């Protein structure tokens, strides 16, 4: 009686789709790199403090883009800073995700109309997966956004584009309130 004849009746054998195992590993060990530029950075730092304990979600902040798989852009992005944001994004390994935190990084904030030096949303230079609104958003909102990124990762499949994963997430009935997801093809002006 060989291994194939015995089957998989033993309790110590794990049989699961490769997608599920890879996605579980990715969403259980999210390594964000914070790119704090203004007031939202204070709330992002508060979220990383002991009161909210992001490590219980498997989220370990990193300072290097080469070690992170999530970029959190928090605050006002000026035209000069946009080049650095793109450079840091390109240094991140695949798969990479972007969370835009606060009104300034989402749409330019209070500077959008009269500020010639302010980028009118970070999604004009890099693709954004999850938006967290607020000025500045509370740490609870950021945690909710991080959990939304984890839901996006859970829905991905090998060979599936990010657009398809967003559509699949919407089909499951998970409402993104107060978070807004956008398709990656519409990002980047």
UniProtKB/Swiss-Prot annotation:
EC number assigned by the record: 7.1.1.-
Quaternary structure and interacting proteins, as annotated: NDH-1 is composed of 14 different subunits. Subunits NuoB, C, D, E, F, and G constitute the peripheral sector of the complex.
UniProt-listed Pfam families: Oxidored_q6
Alphabetized NCBIfam families for the sequence: nuoB_fam, PRK06411.1, PRK14813.1
Main location (coarse class): membrane
Cofactor (UniProt): [4Fe-4S] cluster
Similarity comment: family membership: Belongs to the complex I 20 kDa subunit family.
GO molecular function: 4 iron, 4 sulfur cluster binding; iron ion binding; NADH dehydrogenase (ubiquinone) activity; NADH:ubiquinone reductase (non-electrogenic) activity; quinone binding
Leading EC class: translocase
This protein's name: NADH-quinone oxidoreductase subunit B
Cofactor: how bound: Binds 1 [4Fe-4S] cluster.
Reaction(s) the record says it catalyses: a quinone + NADH + 5 H(+)(in) = a quinol + NAD(+) + 4 H(+)(out)
GO annotations of cellular component type: plasma membrane; respiratory chain complex I
Membrane topology: Peripheral membrane protein
InterPro entries cross-referenced by the UniProt entry: NADH_UbQ_OxRdtase-like_20kDa, NADH_UQ_OxRdtase_20Kd_su
Gene encoding the protein: nuoB
Binding site for [4Fe-4S] cluster: 39-40, 104, 135
Function of the protein: NDH-1 shuttles electrons from NADH, via FMN and iron-sulfur (Fe-S) centers, to quinones in the respiratory chain. The immediate electron acceptor for the enzyme in this species is believed to be a menaquinone. Couples the redox reaction to proton translocation (for every two electrons transferred, four hydrogen ions are translocated across the cytoplasmic membrane), and thus conserves the redox energy in a proton gradient.
The organism's place on the tree of life at top rank: Bacteria
GO annotation, biological process: aerobic respiration; electron transport coupled proton transport
SUPFAM superfamilies per UniProt: HydA/Nqo6-like
Subcellular location: Cell inner membrane
Keyword Translocase recorded: yes
